[in-house]
Amino acid sequence: MASAAEWILFVDDDNELYSDYIINGLRVIRGYPKVGCFGGKLLLPDSIKPPKWTYPFFPFLAIRDFGDERIERVSDHWGPWEPPAAGAFIHRDVLQEYLRRTNSSDKIFKMGRAPGRLLNCEDSLIMLGASKVGRSNAYEPTLKLKHHLAPDRFRFSYLVRFMYGNGRSRVMLDAFSDMPPTVPDFYKANYKFFALILYTLWTERNMPIQYVIGKIAYRFGIKHQLLLKQPDQK
């Protein structure tokens, strides 16, 4: 269905908006005319109590709280200013830029999730388009929603596969976003990659072992996708 609106609010079926979410979003739109995409705090409801070892995974699962200071930036790189699609207000200009990209290559649609494939870089590609049209991304702490994640998303087996998919997604995002590659060259040489794994084990030694394994899975996801040479390949 076509829309003439300048803004669209994305709400997933597991999102519960606070009662003032839309009102505060409209205030942001009026107060910051150059913003292109923005979102806020995505919080777990009190009824969901995952084990503590899952906490380092929260940013990857769209559970985020960067504090009470507003953050805004025009950037073609990821940062706390870039909202996930869940609960995001997105300007028409940004969506038109995404449409332009999809018209140039339908391979972009393979960047999203599909049965048996935990890829998840569609959101980032949309948000990175803001800088292409001269608009910013913003973290707006006045916006709050509860993210009712399914319990199976906190399972170790799922999180390892999810992090592996995140690694693959990073390579695909570079390929489709017109950005300079962000994947370092040491992924391409086996001996350097082995050194990277050892470095990961050392730097993450104080983190839960489940998270360390997840980070290593992320590294292998990057390595795998680079070896495929075709960013859209399974």
Which positions does each model-derived feature cover?
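Conserved nucleotide-sugar donor-binding
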Residues: 4-5, 84-100
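Short aromatic/hydrophobic "clamp" motif used to bind/position activated sugar donors
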Residues: 8
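The conserved acidic donor/metal-binding loop of glycosyltransferases
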Residues: 12-16
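Conserved donor NDP-sugar-binding/catalytic core segment of glycosyltransferases
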Residues: 20-54
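Short, flexible, basic/aromatic active-site loop/helix in glycosyltransferases
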Residues: 58-80
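Catalytic beta-strand/loop signature of glycosyltransferases that borders the donor
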Residues: 102, 108, 138-145
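Acidic donor-binding loop at a coil-to-helix junction in glycosyltransferase catalytic cores
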Residues: 107-126
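Non-catalytic, C-terminal membrane-associated alpha-helical segments of glycosyltransferases
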Residues: 161-165, 178-234
